């Protein structure tokens, strides 16, 4: 009854004629699609926004309870869909979070202000976070104080607030586009915005000196002496329209910046452009912000400075850019001429030999690439049905496009020029010659770390399928964080395209991630990965049907092997996994993964290689950037693929192809004359081949003339225990193999 009364009170609060007020609701959140569903979770709502704290629910990524996990705009008395998976403080990058307690207290209950305090521990540190929402405010104030209660200093921490959206697009710190992690020096503002056409969420973090995860994490690097405290203050600003003008207004007010106003109109434009156009604002040659016009007019306040502005709309060209100097308290008029309207672009992609249609990925290399991503894509995929076909609206103008079928592994990419005119369709037919056909020799590829649209991932199942097929992968695969929600949809898509589907999950505690697959149809996560020790997590994977468990990105800050080394993995080291992952988001860790596996092979332990791209967004990341090839005897099936992978009949590759005369994971036959022979290749041309024996480089062959394919053979030293191969091509891409044993292969791990 209490929960129902709270909901009725909230509805009264959100009525258009209601006075400004803020309401606290205990229980499952009323935010549509929200994840705070437990009896004691807290939702705070006013007439501009709603947010929810996980008190009883389990936050994502193994973060302790007491965190902000839902956030949504409110417009016209209606709460919009949840737009975040997590937006809160993290104490030391995405590393393990050792935790023993959480307390959440309500300090003020409204109607003018709601203030909530969450207290949690992080090892020897105490973290107290205050969340404040006032009536009528469009932003949540967050203040996190971290205190070292231990006897030793906590050095070189990367602490700060984060914004992990669950949908839409991300506009990183202005001036830092393309910077995944590192210094925020050069940033034009200390804010990051998640957005789509109907909403914005902006994290303002004035303290930020470092960025992580492509500006989703805004950090300060610091050291906490014993008993020392440091406070991190920021704001989560929410809007019900994809417009950054209110964000600029808030930034000006928060920092007390001198500012002026620009306003104007879009002259001569068609009705659809005038109704909903965008003015993009650049500063120092970098995208800085944008504002959306209404009925042909716009208005925006900007800090004092020099800017360049242009107008555009969905699939429209850009207007001629205009330069302007904004001075304090100025008010200037800046009108734009109408940009050219949309054209269409159509592709037909096929195999040059058989003329069969090919799934393809098409990327704009040169031409219009909208800064505001809801105005148009830069990456496209051919249709699932009919395959090989694409037709899309696009801004007019000249283009250079890169077309790939096979992810640059099976065939060379093609570069296509096209000129698109307003109101017309430009058609291009592209024939692609496949250089390699691994399935003809029993080799099949998959990307064994790939997300769809759960948690922070933004790829619907159909687009995952289009992307993986365009990469030339032979099996579809998904591994969403702690979720099996997309299994049924992807199974149906795979059946329609007559390809196998491997249903997986990424088990995601704060101290290490594990992919488990193939899962039993209908299986769901049975444990809380935020509190369970490693043994319970791996056991749950096996109960769900997984014959294969791989350790994902083992050596990143929150990777399992890093956490074991730091003593923060609950349960310590548990060896009941099967594979270690080469992850293309951290290629600098490849050598560490290989060194660990080589050590295991020296010990006669049957842990083998896996590979995954860790793709979350197929339009801005590449499925199959690294992939695993597995040899299967007979017809391809999920069970046969998993068995071959687990038996070490595999190699991982960023590009080169390997066909061994003696199968990886098996024993070199005595009658072979102790010779190791391989066919190798790469569409980019080969550079060198390295033979690894017992963990050391035994021989390197440089391949002169950059051949596309070659045969190499080596004499085997019978005193060694195993050999493996590394192949590098002219593009610097590598392939790494599982071992060929010179003695009886060790037994694979039993599930």
Predicted features, each with a name:
Residues 24-32, 36-38, 43-45, 56-58, ...:
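Beta-strand-rich recognition/accessory modules
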Residues 36, 86-137, 149, 211-216:
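Extended, loop-rich substrate-binding clefts of extracytoplasmic carbohydrate-active enzymes
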Residues 44, 51, 140-148, 678:
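Short, well-ordered beta-strand segments enriched in hydrophobic/aromatic residues
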Residues 136-175:
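Acidic (Asp/Glu-rich), glycine- and aromatic
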Residues 141, 306-308, 344, 398-400, ...:
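Short, conserved beta-strand segments of beta-strand-rich sandwich/propeller modules, principally
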Residues 268-270, 326-383, 390-392, 404, ...:
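Charged catalytic cores and adjacent phosphate/nucleic-acid-binding surfaces used
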Residues 304-315, 362, 396-407:
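A short, solvent-exposed beta-strand micro-motif common in secreted/extracellular proteins
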Residues 427-476:
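An acidic-aromatic substrate-binding cleft motif
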């Amino acid at each position: 009854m209490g929960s129902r009364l709270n909901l009725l009170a909230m509805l009264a609060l959100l009525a258009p004629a209601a006075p400004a007020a803020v309401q606290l609701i205990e229980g499952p959140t009323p935010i549509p699609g929200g994840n705070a569903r437990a009896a004691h979770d807290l939702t705070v709502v006013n007439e501009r926004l709603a947010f929810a704290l996980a008190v009883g629910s389990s936050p994502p990524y193994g973060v302790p309870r007491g965190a902000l996990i839902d956030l949504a705009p409110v417009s016209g008395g209606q709460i919009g869909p949840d737009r975040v998976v997590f937006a809160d403080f993290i104490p030391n990058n995405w590393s393990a979070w050792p935790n023993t307690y959480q307390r959440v207290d309500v300090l003020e209950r409204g109607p003018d202000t709601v203030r909530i305090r969450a207290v949690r521990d992080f090892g020897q540190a105490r973290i107290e976070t205050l969340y404040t929402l006032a009536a009528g405010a469009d932003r949540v104030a967050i203040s996190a104080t971290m205190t070292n209660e231990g006897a030793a200093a906590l050095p070189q921490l990367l602490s700060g607030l984060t914004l992990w959206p669950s949908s839409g697009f991300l506009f990183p710190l202005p001036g830092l586009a393309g910077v995944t992690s590192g210094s925020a020096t050069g940033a034009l503002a200390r804010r990051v915005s998640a957005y789509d056409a109907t909403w914005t969420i902006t994290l303002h973090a004035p303290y930020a000196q470092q960025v992580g995860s492509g500006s989703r994490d805004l950090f300060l690097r610091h050291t906490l002496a014993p008993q020392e405290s440091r406070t991190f203050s920021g704001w989560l600003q929410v809007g019900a329209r994809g417009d950054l003008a209110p964000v600029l207004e808030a930034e000006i007010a928060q920092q007390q910046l001198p500012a002026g106003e620009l306003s104007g109109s879009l002259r001569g434009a068609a009705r659809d452009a005038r109704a909903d156009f965008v003015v993009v604002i650049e500063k120092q040659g970098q995208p800085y912000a944008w504002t959306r016009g209404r009925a042909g007019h716009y208005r925006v306040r900007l800090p004092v400075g020099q800017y360049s502005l242009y107008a555009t709309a969905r699939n429209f060209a850009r207007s001629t850019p205009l330069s302007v100097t904004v001075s304090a308290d100025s008010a200037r008029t800046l009108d734009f001429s109408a940009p050219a309207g949309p054209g269409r672009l159509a592709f037909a992609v096929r195999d040059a030999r058989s003329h069969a249609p090919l799934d393809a990925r098409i990327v704009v290399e040169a031409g219009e690439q909208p800064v505001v991503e809801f105005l148009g894509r830069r990456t496209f995929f051919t249709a699932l049905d009919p395959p090989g076909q694409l037709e899309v609206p696009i801004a007019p103008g000249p283009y250079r496009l890169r077309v790939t079928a096979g992810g640059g592994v099976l065939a060379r990419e093609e570069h296509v020029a096209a000129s698109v005119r307003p109101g017309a369709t430009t058609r291009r037919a592209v024939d692609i010659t496949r250089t390699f056909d691994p399935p003809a020799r029993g080799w099949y590829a998959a990307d064994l770390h790939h997300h769809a649209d759960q948690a922070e991932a933004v790829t619907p199942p159909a687009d995952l399928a289009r992307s993986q097929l365009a990469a030339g992968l032979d099996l579809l695969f998904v591994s969403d964080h702690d979720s099996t929600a997309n299994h049924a949809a992807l199974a149906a898509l795979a059946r329609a395209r007559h390809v196998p589907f491997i249903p997986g999950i990424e088990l995601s505690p704060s101290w290490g991630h594990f992919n488990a697959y193939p899962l039993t149809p209908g299986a769901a996560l049975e444990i809380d990965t935020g509190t369970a020790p490693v043994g319970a997590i791996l056991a749950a994977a096996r109960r769900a049907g997984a014959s294969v468990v791989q350790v994902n990105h083992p050596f990143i800050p929150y990777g399992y092997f890093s956490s074991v080394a730091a003593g923060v993995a609950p349960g310590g080291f548990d060896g009941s996994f099967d594979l270690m992952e080469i992850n293309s988001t951290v290629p600098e860790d490849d050598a560490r993964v290989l060194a660990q596996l080589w050590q295991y092979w020296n010990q006669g332990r049957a842990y083998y290689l896996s590979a995954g791209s860790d793709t979350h967004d197929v339009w801005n990341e590449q499925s199959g950037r690294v992939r695993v090839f597995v040899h299967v005897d007979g017809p391809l099936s999920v069970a046969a693929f998993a068995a071959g992978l687990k038996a070490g009949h595999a190699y991982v590759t960023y590009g080169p192809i390997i066909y061994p005369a003696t199968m990886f994971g098996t024993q070199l036959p005595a009658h072979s004359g102790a010779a190791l022979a391989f066919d190798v290749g790469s569409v980019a041309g080969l550079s060198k081949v390295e033979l690894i024996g017992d963990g050391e480089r035994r021989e390197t062959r440089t391949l002169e003339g950059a051949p596309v394919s070659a045969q190499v053979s080596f004499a085997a030293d019978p005193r060694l225990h195993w050999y493996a191969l590394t192949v590098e091509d002219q593009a610097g891409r590598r392939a790494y193999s599982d071992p060929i044993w010179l003695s009886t292969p060790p037994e694979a791990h039993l599930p």
